[in-house]
Amino acid sequence: MATLCRPAIAVPEHVITMQQTLDLARETHAGHPQRDLVLRLIRNTGVQTRHLVQPIDETLRHPGFEVRNRVYEAEAKARVPDVVRRALAHAETEAAEIDLIVYVSCTGFMMPSLTAWIINTMGFRPETRQLPIAQLGCAAGGAAINRAHDFCRAYPGSNVLIVSCEFCSLCYQPTDIGVGSLLSNGLFGDALSAAVVRGQGGTGMRLERNGSHLVPDTEDWISYAVRDTGFHFLLDKRVPGTMEMLAPVLQDLVDLHGWSVPDMDFFIVHAGGPRILDDLCHFLNLPPEMFRYSRATLTERGNIASSVVFDALARLFDDGGAAEAAQGLIAGFGPGITAEVAVGSWAKHGLPADDVRDLDALELTGGVALSG
């Protein structure tokens, strides 16, 4: 089965703290009639630090969509190779062994996709398939994992490289002064990530089942208005309450797989804001500790769009990984309103869960397998 291996993460060197964000909001929007509400909402995000691809002074300027998109392309080409090389190393594989590259980004536009540049410059085969995903927003991390899983099921033994590049700060619009826009200015950060899904072998989450769900008639809740000045992010005030609708989707996929949510060992979910995590705890009846990796990503990086799930998963790896055969779930949420969900078990060097249990039994009994 396909195994999602350890992700590689990178964040730009320019950092802005919550206090700096609050100070900027006070100064820039001194006369805003709802300034106090905006400041309170920014504090409530819990986002302590964010990373930006440009210094804050440059971020706050708007030189035009053309210039910003040139910055996007230049910075992506400068920074993506590092996470790609590290992800390949984590998965103990090489560029020539990759059969599909999935590239996800909603914060800049290139045609051809960056996948073509990656293939041409980093030693990938010309036959490598390309799958750019540009319009699923924050759900794209989960979607990339699921499409990689689907590909490995369709072509057994294949390997997939996922690359996420999100420079959310390049979408800052100084003329957007609605409460939702000002909140977003204090929530989103920049990051890059990459991970390999191996068709055989590897250590990580063995992908066993995936699913997608679109909440009917919510397509205007999270959206872009594409104007001369670029992408204008629109966020409906109803978005924070979407987990009441999406928690049952997670529950149903776990049930369909024959597992039980209370018995799950780890959850890696898109942390678009603190209420998402709080509501998942409530509606799934889970302790906050189950979402600690996603919470840490939100606190230290902000909402980094499609890279959130990879950053949170990397934190699980940094923590020593899950126990052998541990049951887990990954979920991305984004425009649509869309949920992309995967369930699977932790694999030791790609061993199936039953083989891992047999290996543990051998270790515990000095090499003699226990039988029923």
Q: Model-predicted segments: where are they?
A:
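Condensing-enzyme catalytic core mediating Claisen C-C bond formation in acyl metabolism
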Residues: M1-A74, P174-E244, P248, D252, ...
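Conserved beta-ketoacyl condensing-enzyme motif
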Residues: T45-F124, Q130-Q135, V261-L277
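Claisen-condensing/thiolase-fold acyl-transfer catalytic domains that form or cleave C-C bonds
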Residues: P81, C106-T107, W117-N120, R125-E127, ...
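Short, well-ordered amphipathic alpha-helical segments that serve as non-catalytic structural scaffolds
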Residues: V53, E75-A91, R147, L192, ...
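Active-site-adjacent elements of ketosynthase-type condensing enzymes
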Residues: M110-A116, I162-L183, G211-D228, P274-H282, ...
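Short beta-strand segments
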Residues: R6-A8, V104, A134, L161-E166, ...
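Short coil/turn connectors at secondary-structure junctions
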Residues: M1-A2, A95-D99, P126-R129, Y155-V160, ...
